[in-house]
From Swiss-Prot:
Full protein name: Large ribosomal subunit protein bL28A
Organism expressing this protein natively: Streptomyces coelicolor (strain ATCC BAA-471 / A3(2) / M145)
Annotated Gene Ontology cellular component terms: ribonucleoprotein complex; ribosome
InterPro entries the UniProt entry points to: Bacterial_rp_bL28, Ribosomal_bL28, Ribosomal_bL28/bL31-like_sf, Ribosomal_bL28_bact-type, Ribosomal_bL28_sf
UniProt keyword terms in alphabetical order: Ribonucleoprotein, Ribosomal protein
Pfam families cross-referenced by the UniProt entry: Ribosomal_L28 (PF00830)
PANTHER family: 50S RIBOSOMAL PROTEIN L28, LARGE RIBOSOMAL SUBUNIT PROTEIN BL28A
UniProt record similarity statement: Belongs to the bacterial ribosomal protein bL28 family.
Gene Ontology BP annotations: translation
GO-annotated molecular function: structural constituent of ribosome
Gene assigned in the entry: rpmB1
Superkingdom of origin organism: Bacteria
Length: 61
């Protein structure tokens, strides 16, 4: 599944896991993307939307 929001364009954030011995390994934080059925220009369509866009009402379900 794509880790990008079709509404706001939010994508993954990158950083490091840091262990107790302070070794670093790269990792990524994916946004919480949900596949939502919404109406886009009069036709129902499925879009990938992050939960912050769904909560903010930017996606009409």
């Amino acid at each position: 599944m794509a880790a990008n929001c079709d509404v706001c364009g939010k994508g993954p954030g990158f950083g490091n896991n840091i262990s107790h011995s302070h070794r670093r390994t790269s990792r990524r934080w994916n946004p919480n993307i949900q596949r939502v059925r919404t109406v886009v220009s009069g036709t129902p369509k499925r879009v990938n939307a992050c939960t912050s866009c769904i909560k903010a009402g930017k996606v009409s379900r």
